[in-house]
């Protein structure tokens, strides 16, 4: 078996163990750096820039972001295999936007699948479909955020239109085994009656 892919390098800003919200069962979430959207309400603003940053948090300067190999990430992920097996959990990639590091994301998902883990990605879908295709062979669940259906409103609040996101949602639905579309309800943005 060719294990060269385990040396693939990517940039992350966090690994969160024992999550139960982003896929089935108990999961480890790997947060990748970099996102093309600039959502005003972003819960992970430290994820938006791809570069490693010094940020002030709670009055202290903290380095946000680090370069890691797939092997290094999997060493952390595999610590909780008994919990995944018992709960049907596994690995979820989040961000930022994992699709902006497609080779690293695909290699992480491949490593998880080769270790018998359930895999998921939480994503905006704002990337070329070719990036998504790299992940599909190793993906059990695609959790897709669709923030607004109106492109002008979407652009006003995220910095980007949503045509690519909607086109990718259709393609993902046709090509991925399991797609769940989620919409964060944001007051003043998408919380009005239809």
Spans of features found by a protein language model:
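N-terminal [4Fe-4S]-dependent radical SAM core
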Residues: 1-68, 79-85
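Conserved AdoMet/S-adenosylmethionine-binding subsite of the radical SAM
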Residues: 74, 78-194
């Amino acid at each position: 078996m060719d294990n060269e892919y385990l040396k693939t390098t990517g940039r992350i800003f966090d690994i969160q163990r024992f999550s139960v919200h982003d896929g089935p069962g108990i999961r480890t979430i790997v947060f990748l750096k970099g996102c093309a959207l600039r959502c005003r309400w972003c819960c992970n603003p430290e994820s938006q820039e791809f570069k490693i940053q010094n940020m002030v948090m709670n009055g202290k300067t903290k380095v946000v972001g680090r370069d890691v190999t797939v092997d290094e990430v999997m060493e952390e992920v595999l610590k909780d295999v008994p919990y995944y097996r018992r709960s049907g959990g596994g690995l979820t990639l989040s961000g930022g936007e994992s699709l902006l590091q497609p080779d690293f994301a695909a290699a992480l998902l491949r490593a998880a699948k080769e270790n018998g883990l359930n895999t998921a990605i939480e994503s905006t879908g704002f990337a070329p479909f070719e990036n998504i295709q790299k992940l599909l062979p190793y993906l059990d669940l695609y959790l897709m955020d669709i923030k607004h259906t109106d492109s002008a409103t979407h652009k006003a609040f995220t910095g980007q239109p949503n045509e690519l996101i909607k086109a990718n949602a259709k393609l993902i639905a046709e090509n991925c085994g399991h797609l769940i579309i989620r919409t964060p309800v944001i007051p003043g943005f998408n919380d009005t009656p239809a």
